[in-house]
């Protein structure tokens, strides 16, 4: 289990021409969705995360078009479950930053995942990425954000 750490994150959101004036290659939010599973642990299979699957589907994930993913899993088991729920293929680069296993900044972890994907798109290291945030000890709440470059 990852160590809990202090930390923070800030992301600048801008639309259209303003975004283009701030950087050469903006990372555009193409889809975002948040879903919640039951917090009662006895009512679902803990080897799955249905809310993560649904959030990814509604955000617009298509596994053949995801270059990289930053997943907020605080254990390697959670990362494995989430990779499966998102339908990531073998070519998708996962948690190049080290992910939340390296350090879990709790409430900033999701935004950090988004900033990591955006940073790689802005620097032309990727064209399309998935950023994920979760809350709850058993992946009960899941947010998926799909970002793309131009």
Task: Give a label for each model feature.
Residues 1-150:
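Claisen-condensing/thiolase-fold acyl-transfer catalytic domains that form or cleave C-C bonds
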């Amino acid at each position: 289990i990852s160590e809990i750490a202090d930390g923070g994150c800030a992301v600048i959101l801008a639309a259209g021409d303003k975004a283009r004036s701030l950087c050469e290659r903006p990372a555009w939010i193409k889809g975002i969705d948040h879903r919640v599973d039951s917090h009662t642990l006895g009512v679902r299979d803990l080897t799955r995360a249905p809310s993560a699957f649904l959030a990814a589907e509604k955000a617009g994930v298509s596994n053949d078009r995801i270059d990289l993913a930053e997943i907020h899993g605080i254990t390697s088991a959670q990362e494995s479950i989430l990779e499966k729920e998102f339908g990531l293929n073998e070519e998708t680069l996962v948690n190049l930053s080290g992910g939340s296993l390296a350090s879990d900044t709790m409430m900033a972890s999701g935004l950090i995942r988004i900033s990591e994907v955006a940073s790689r798109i802005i620097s032309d290291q990727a064209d399309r990425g998935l950023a994920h945030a979760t809350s709850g000890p058993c992946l009960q709440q899941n947010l998926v954000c799909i970002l793309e470059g131009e």
